[in-house]
Amino acid sequence: MGSELKIENLNVKVSDKQVLFDLNLTVAGGQIHAIMGPNGSGKSTLASSILKKPGYEIISGSIFVEGTDITTMSPYEIAQQNMFVSGQYPLEIPGVTVIDLLSASSVVEKSEQEIQRIGESLSIPKDLLERGLNVELSGGERKRLDIFQLLVTMPKICVLDELDSGLDVDALEELAAKVYSLSKETSMTVLVITHYARILEILKPDKVHVLRGGKITKSGGFELATELEITGYDN
């Protein structure tokens, strides 16, 4: 059984403007949940708050990973909880490659050969793995590196913000299928944040939540995502 991700009464502000209001969400261990919503609804703010990205201030509320309160933890401490968060605009780190980062991680248990095979399975060129982390990369390249890190570290929980951004249809289907397979093989808990239902056709979420005005206003199964594609968020 995977680890539970629980968010209780989360209030977050960005640049002195409150964006999330008393947000509550529980993703049971091993489940896949999706958050959908219009632009400006607070979707990426939620991911950035979990990641503890600078500029996102948690006013009140708590975030728990398997019962452990991570609300005041640093990004490094959160990573030690075996949790992976992929943001829309990852930090660029010149001089530090993704291989350097993974080598320094205490949660990586794969051999060099296994890591190399994972890179090959994602069609990641060797020079990309040797480049500074997220430096001068396209949106698609960044997403491939995110999934590469995910497959190498095999976290208990992953949060993916706009995985479909910057990817063509074939690449999106390929990467989403790898996330789905890893979740089913390892009981990894997944929270995916997206605008579109297409990725959810592959991820087959247990639950879909609608985020509007900084609050979750509706929850349901995959059929909710299909409904939103037809009716939009105003109905």
Map each language-model feature to its residues.
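Q-loop/switch helix immediately C-terminal to the Walker
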Residues: 88-89, 94-114
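Conserved beta-strand-loop-alpha-helix hinge in the C-terminal portion
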Residues: 202, 207, 211, 215-235
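The feature captures the beta-strand-to-loop junction immediately N-terminal to the Walker
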Residues: 36-38
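ABC ATPase C-loop
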Residues: 150-151
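Hydrophobic anchor residue at the start of the ABC signature
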Residues: 146-147
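Walker B catalytic motif
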Residues: 159-163, 170
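Conserved structural motif at the start of ABC-family nucleotide-binding domains
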Residues: 5-7, 19-22
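ABC ATPase NBD Q-loop/coupling interface
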Residues: 62-78, 134
